[in-house]
Amino acid sequence: MKKLLIRETFDTFLLSEASITTFSTFQIDGHFHPEFLSTGEAELLTVENCGYALWRRIRPFFFELTKGKNTPLRFHIVFRLAPHNVEALLVRSGLTLSSGDVDGLFLNIHFDGSALTCTSGTSLRVFSLDKGLERAWDSMLEKFFHQKEIPFL
Protein backbone atom coordinates (compact mmCIF):
# COMPACT_ATOMS: atom_id res chain seq x y z
CA MET A 1 0.00 0.00 0.00
CA LYS A 2 2.92 2.30 0.79
CA LYS A 3 4.26 1.92 -2.76
CA LEU A 4 0.89 2.92 -4.17
CA LEU A 5 0.01 5.84 -1.90
CA ILE A 6 3.29 7.25 -0.57
CA ARG A 7 6.12 6.32 -2.90
CA GLU A 8 6.59 7.26 -6.56
CA THR A 9 6.20 3.67 -7.77
CA PHE A 10 3.12 4.28 -9.97
CA ASP A 11 3.70 7.98 -10.70
CA THR A 12 4.31 7.50 -14.43
CA PHE A 13 0.92 5.86 -14.96
CA LEU A 14 -2.00 7.96 -16.10
CA LEU A 15 -5.11 7.92 -13.95
CA SER A 16 -8.28 6.99 -15.79
CA GLU A 17 -10.51 7.09 -12.72
CA ALA A 18 -10.55 6.35 -9.01
CA SER A 19 -12.95 6.11 -6.11
CA ILE A 20 -12.41 5.75 -2.40
CA THR A 21 -14.90 5.10 0.38
CA THR A 22 -14.09 6.31 3.88
CA PHE A 23 -16.78 8.23 5.80
CA SER A 24 -18.11 9.14 2.34
CA THR A 25 -17.38 8.05 -1.21
CA PHE A 26 -15.10 10.24 -3.30
CA GLN A 27 -14.94 9.88 -7.09
CA ILE A 28 -11.98 11.14 -9.13
CA ASP A 29 -12.16 11.59 -12.88
CA GLY A 30 -8.64 11.34 -14.29
CA HIS A 31 -9.27 13.61 -17.28
CA PHE A 32 -6.66 16.34 -17.39
CA HIS A 33 -7.63 20.00 -17.85
CA PRO A 34 -4.51 21.92 -18.98
CA GLU A 35 -6.43 25.22 -19.04
CA PHE A 36 -6.23 25.15 -15.23
CA LEU A 37 -2.45 25.62 -15.38
CA SER A 38 -0.48 28.73 -16.20
CA THR A 39 0.94 28.97 -19.74
CA GLY A 40 4.44 28.13 -18.49
CA GLU A 41 3.27 25.05 -16.62
CA ALA A 42 1.15 23.88 -19.55
CA GLU A 43 4.12 24.12 -21.92
CA LEU A 44 6.06 21.65 -19.76
CA LEU A 45 3.45 18.94 -20.24
CA THR A 46 4.25 15.96 -22.39
CA VAL A 47 2.51 12.78 -21.31
CA GLU A 48 -0.62 14.49 -20.02
CA ASN A 49 -1.36 15.95 -23.45
CA CYS A 50 -3.11 12.64 -24.12
CA GLY A 51 -5.97 13.78 -21.89
CA TYR A 52 -5.30 12.08 -18.55
CA ALA A 53 -3.48 13.27 -15.44
CA LEU A 54 -0.44 11.48 -14.12
CA TRP A 55 -0.91 9.61 -10.85
CA ARG A 56 1.83 11.76 -9.30
CA ARG A 57 -0.52 14.79 -9.51
CA ILE A 58 -3.42 13.00 -7.84
CA ARG A 59 -1.62 10.70 -5.41
CA PRO A 60 -1.22 13.35 -2.64
CA PHE A 61 -4.97 14.09 -2.68
CA PHE A 62 -5.86 10.39 -2.71
CA PHE A 63 -3.42 9.73 0.14
CA GLU A 64 -4.96 12.56 2.15
CA LEU A 65 -8.32 10.76 1.94
CA THR A 66 -6.77 7.57 3.39
CA LYS A 67 -5.07 9.21 6.37
CA GLY A 68 -6.41 8.69 9.85
CA LYS A 69 -6.85 5.84 12.26
CA ASN A 70 -9.34 3.94 10.09
CA THR A 71 -8.54 1.98 6.95
CA PRO A 72 -10.65 2.94 3.90
CA LEU A 73 -13.68 0.72 3.49
CA ARG A 74 -12.72 0.26 -0.16
CA PHE A 75 -11.05 1.94 -3.09
CA HIS A 76 -10.66 1.36 -6.79
CA ILE A 77 -8.01 2.88 -9.06
CA VAL A 78 -7.82 2.48 -12.84
CA PHE A 79 -4.43 3.32 -14.32
CA ARG A 80 -3.69 3.56 -18.04
CA LEU A 81 -0.35 3.14 -19.70
CA ALA A 82 0.88 6.33 -21.38
CA PRO A 83 0.60 6.28 -25.21
CA HIS A 84 4.37 6.41 -25.77
CA ASN A 85 4.74 3.36 -23.52
CA VAL A 86 1.97 1.54 -25.41
CA GLU A 87 3.90 2.20 -28.62
CA ALA A 88 7.13 0.93 -27.03
CA LEU A 89 5.39 -2.25 -25.84
CA LEU A 90 3.98 -2.91 -29.33
CA VAL A 91 7.41 -2.49 -30.93
CA ARG A 92 9.26 -4.50 -28.27
CA SER A 93 6.73 -7.34 -28.49
CA GLY A 94 6.74 -7.46 -32.29
CA LEU A 95 2.96 -7.22 -32.45
CA THR A 96 1.23 -6.30 -35.70
CA LEU A 97 -1.19 -3.89 -34.02
CA SER A 98 -0.53 -0.18 -34.41
CA SER A 99 -0.83 2.26 -31.52
CA GLY A 100 -3.97 3.60 -33.23
CA ASP A 101 -5.56 0.17 -32.80
CA VAL A 102 -5.09 0.28 -29.02
CA ASP A 103 -7.58 2.31 -27.01
CA GLY A 104 -5.78 1.60 -23.74
CA LEU A 105 -3.82 -0.75 -21.52
CA PHE A 106 -5.15 -0.67 -17.98
CA LEU A 107 -4.16 -1.69 -14.49
CA ASN A 108 -7.14 -1.98 -12.13
CA ILE A 109 -6.34 -1.85 -8.42
CA HIS A 110 -9.13 -2.76 -6.03
CA PHE A 111 -9.01 -2.73 -2.23
CA ASP A 112 -12.00 -4.29 -0.47
CA GLY A 113 -11.04 -3.33 3.07
CA SER A 114 -8.79 -6.32 3.63
CA ALA A 115 -7.15 -7.41 0.36
CA LEU A 116 -5.62 -5.58 -2.59
CA THR A 117 -6.25 -7.03 -6.06
CA CYS A 118 -4.61 -5.97 -9.32
CA THR A 119 -6.11 -6.89 -12.68
CA SER A 120 -4.82 -6.03 -16.13
CA GLY A 121 -7.08 -4.93 -18.96
CA THR A 122 -6.84 -4.09 -22.63
CA SER A 123 -9.12 -2.14 -24.91
CA LEU A 124 -8.80 -2.24 -28.68
CA ARG A 125 -10.41 -0.03 -31.30
CA VAL A 126 -10.38 -2.95 -33.74
CA PHE A 127 -11.63 -6.52 -33.48
CA SER A 128 -8.91 -9.10 -32.93
CA LEU A 129 -8.83 -12.69 -31.73
CA ASP A 130 -5.08 -12.39 -31.15
CA LYS A 131 -4.27 -12.37 -27.43
CA GLY A 132 -0.65 -11.29 -28.01
CA LEU A 133 -1.21 -7.80 -26.65
CA GLU A 134 -2.85 -9.14 -23.49
CA ARG A 135 0.05 -11.53 -22.91
CA ALA A 136 2.63 -8.79 -23.57
CA TRP A 137 0.86 -6.38 -21.19
CA ASP A 138 0.60 -9.06 -18.47
CA SER A 139 4.28 -9.87 -18.92
CA MET A 140 5.22 -6.20 -18.69
CA LEU A 141 3.20 -5.81 -15.49
CA GLU A 142 4.81 -8.91 -13.96
CA LYS A 143 8.26 -7.47 -14.72
CA PHE A 144 7.20 -4.11 -13.28
CA PHE A 145 5.94 -5.72 -10.05
CA HIS A 146 9.09 -7.82 -9.76
CA GLN A 147 11.36 -4.81 -10.38
CA LYS A 148 9.47 -2.73 -7.79
CA GLU A 149 9.46 -5.67 -5.33
CA ILE A 150 5.68 -5.89 -5.24
CA PRO A 151 4.57 -9.46 -4.44
CA PHE A 152 1.97 -10.99 -6.76
CA LEU A 153 0.42 -14.35 -7.56
Enumerate the language-model features and the residues they cover.
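Generic alpha-helix detector with strongest preference for long hydrophobic helices that associate
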Residues: 4, 13, 17, 58, ...
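Phenylalanine-focused residue identity feature
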Residues: 10-13, 23-26, 32, 36, ...
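General N-terminal targeting signals
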Residues: 27, 32, 37-40, 45, ...
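Surface-exposed, low-hydrophobicity interaction/linker segments
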Residues: 49-115
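Mixed-charge, glycine-accented linear interaction segment located at domain edges/termini
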Residues: 116-153
